[in-house]
Regions:
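Topology signature of small-to-medium multi-pass alpha-helical membrane proteins
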Residues: 2, 8-197
Length: 197
């Protein structure tokens, strides 16, 4: 708070104002690598959020051996007590429900992708620290959900640790690497001459 003007907030000394001069952005810098990695993660979410529903609506819940809905074919057969191809033949309403369920997941993936791409492009590129940490935390926020899914499968005697590592491991690793590299790039950029952005 400003002593002369009660109720008026003053910008923090730690983080410059959004319109303050900043070092010029360079793609071939550490911050540029971080922005690129977060854009790739957003692009992957965007791609899957488009491709999965299209594939499921065109070819059904059992397309690609059911991997788009429940992972490895043997696993989903054990989890459901019957395979997705059997469900499509004997219970089309359940198959349609599973496709609709995947649609809801893909809707959230799309909104996350748009937000992640916008955050990387408009805020992280301008070296906003909050954007870096928000990008990391938003990627890590999915981990507890995948652990809960893994727990549910494990309760039914289905080993899915390897599948979960393949599913979420690369995105978590990329997000952590992007954050470390981006933080290093921001610290390094503090020594460069500032320009108006």
């Amino acid at each position: 708070m400003d002593a002369k003007h009660p109720g008026v907030r003053v910008a923090s000394d730690r983080e410059p104002a959004a319109n303050a001069p900043r070092p010029p952005f360079r793609w071939k810098s550490r911050l540029g690598v971080a922005v690129t990695l977060f854009l790739i993660l957003g692009g992957l979410n965007f791609s899957f959020a488009v491709a999965v529903p299209i594939t499921l609506h065109l070819f059904g819940a059992a397309s690609f051996g059911g991997q788009l809905v429940l992972g490895d074919g043997a696993d989903h057969c054990a989890f459901l007590g019957r395979c997705l191809s059997d469900i499509e033949r004997s219970d089309p309403a359940m198959a349609a429900f599973l496709v609709a369920f995947m649609d809801t997941m893909c809707a959230f993936m799309m909104s996350f992708a748009v937000l992640q791409i916008g955050l990387a492009w408009y805020a992280l590129r301008r070296a906003q620290k909050w954007a870096l940490w928000s990008s990391l935390i938003s990627n890590l926020a999915a981990v507890p959900y995948y652990l809960a899914i893994g727990w549910m499968w494990a309760e039914r005697g289905i080993p899915v640790v390897g599948s979960l590592l393949v599913t979420i491991g690369p995105t978590v690793i990329l997000a952590i690497v992007a954050t470390v590299v981006g933080r290093s790039g921001m610290q390094r950029a503090k020594g460069l001459p500032a320009t108006a952005s």
